[in-house]
Amino acid sequence: VKLKREKPEFKNLKYKKIISYLSKMDNSRSDIALVSNKKILETGTSNLLFVKDQKFFTPKKDFYEGNTYKFFKRKIKKIIKKDILIKEIKNYDEILLVGSGKGVTSVRTIDEIKWKRKNLEKFKFLSKHYDLVINKCNTYRFN
């Protein structure tokens, strides 16, 4: 979707437009990418981490840094910030969605550009760290 947050530090800016796209799909199986000037910024529900040659990459700017993204920033020794161009996505081995609702999820395919994940190595690494923290949390039931 050709859309970016005008002030990425504020999560809710233009969120109604994002929700209108998300409401038309099964969010447990798919998401929308927010793209501006041929650069991918984030998804409708999550931040993005790209993996190539064992290194993590993230968009340089113009995206909202969610809490789960901030958690992983502390766990990953180095995340390289760069413009993630649509035409270069085929070069990445893994694409990971990170967000409060999803935790960490591995993108299997992007049909529109014929991208397919090459492995799950970094996904498994991040999932392990995330699950350790989440499983320590108390749960409360509200009736």
Predicted features by range, described:
Residues 1-143:
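Helix-start/capping segments and mature chain N-termini
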